[in-house]
Amino acid sequence: MTEHVNSYYAASANKHAPYPTLTEQLECDVCVIGAGYTGLSSALHLAEKGYRVVVLEAARVGFGASGRNGGQIVNSYSRDIDTIEANCPPDQARLLGSMLFEGGQIIRERIKRYNIQCDLQEGGVFAAETEKQLHELKSQYARWQKWGNDQLELLDAKGVREVVASDRYVGALLDKSGGHIHPLNLALGEAEAIRIQGGLIFEQSAVTSITPGQPALVKTAKGAVKARFVVVAGNAYLGNLVPELASKSMPCGTQVIATEVLGEERARSLLPQNYCLEDCNYLLDYYRTSGDHRLLYGGGVVYGARDPADIERLIIPKMLKTFPQLADVKVEYTWTGNFLLTLSRLPQFGRIGPNIYYMQGYSGHGVTCTHLAGKLLSEVLSGQAERFDAFAKLPHYPFPGGRLFRIPFTAAGAAWYTLRDRLGV
């Protein structure tokens, strides 16, 4: 059986009973493939509307990126809204802009409605290491205000040192509508909410085939589901189940470490307001403190979903560059997880035939975008396709180099942007 990786999140997960493996033939309205945030959000929105929902998960609820990520509620999409405005028709850009901050609102509504215990903390910081990055943050401030975010504050060098005890930054953008959570506990809470709403979840039930039709037939090793609709929500862990999706996306790994417990006083000395933080580099660092006062620090990207040989060797120098005062601190957990990157860094939504839908490729902004995706999926199945189609109409292209050479091509591009970050150009 495939279990959760040995992460801090798995070690501190809320108590929960495992879900059964599918061993029978079922019929339902919607079969959701994948119990990460995309699948859970879709299933919960649909179950609340009265749909009969079955969720099939190859491993455990929140096994992939949804249970391993940095836990940061980051608003917007991975690609800035100005790029969308410059490349999309005005009506489409307007729709996409109107949804920039909706994902975080959905998360908070879920936490409140279902009393999900996941260490929700408010506030997130985007920190600039160079004047060029700070100038870009000022532009982002103006754009986000235009689209309705009135919880923003620009911080100068003095201001940023009041929210993070580091000399690394020249300024920052504080988004008080951002925040952070224990990501696995959020996923587990949402799964329980699906159960409360009458949905069925099956773990250790990897899908082996999808046969289109009315109804569609979804098979696992020991069972099958006939469904009016199918939602493909495997993201970076989908494998080759749907080959036509593979060429336009690429799994990438990112690494996270968790220190020993620092104690509340020392943890607050690092991040006095308990905000989460990410920098503005192309290959960015991100970090926050946990509910039990550890520092969780992540960064770097491994293209092609290969596990890094030594996570501590990669991440500890990054942590000490930001917080040299932690040189004496032990690291207790290290792990990696895959997210799905698209060439445009915009999510991929679409249809495979009349009744099979997919949402994937959040490119590092999955915590919020996945929750929005589930809501939009429930809308389109209820006959309201406009907002879903605003994403579905976004163009997507294969990675250069094909399956054999796309990793070195993409890594070379990332190395170029990393060099630009270091040079401040």
Question: Model regions: which residues?
Answer:
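Extreme N-terminal leader/targeting segments of oxidoreductases
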Residues: 1-30
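Flavin (FAD/FMN) cofactor-binding and adjacent substrate-gating region
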Residues: 2-12, 79-85, 106-123, 128-189
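N-terminal Rossmann-like FAD-binding beta1-loop-alpha1 element of flavoenzymes
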Residues: 28-55
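Glycine-rich FAD pyrophosphate-binding loop
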Residues: 48-68
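Glycine-rich active-site loop/strand segments that organize a redox cofactor
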Residues: 68-98
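Active-site substrate-recognition segment that forms the wall
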Residues: 105, 113-121, 207-209, 224-354
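Helical element adjacent to the flavin cofactor pocket in flavoenzyme catalytic cores
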Residues: 139-143, 168-228
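C-terminal catalytic lobe of FAD-dependent flavoproteins
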Residues: 305-307, 312-422
